[in-house]
């Protein structure tokens, strides 16, 4: 989802008002911030979003741990959007930020990094290691969380039965095509049986 400035400001205020969340991290980052730490938070927040079935997680610069808007000078001279390409080089599956937003709140510059969830069945790694949130910090992704994410790969939703579904929910062209293929398959089987019988195979 792409946010407008006003929509994102409302969302940030909601996140600030909410209790502690494993998919949101606020950092002052008044001037600079470690690129390696950004990568670790990317991995951790991406994995936590996956485990909670969410479409995004957030790393927000310019807001203190006690949720005061203080502003940030991080990459103010340029290079902010190039961070998308820089992150790709050290994540698996070439994951990067969904979007990087730069906005003003209370006359202060704020940067909001929109992070995607880990791909189903594959924990997001940074430089080969997968991370998770642990209270106010990050830690290696625990094995139980690794197993939870990896177990998703075995789910085949196409085999699931939708109890409420009716024939009206199916595409008419797809039904016609399926009938044609089924009919052809049955005819091929009959021909094969006849062939085997004639030649006593």
Listing of model-derived features with the role each one plays in the protein:
Residues 1-201:
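Conserved N-terminal catalytic/coupling substructures associated with nucleotide/phosphate chemistry
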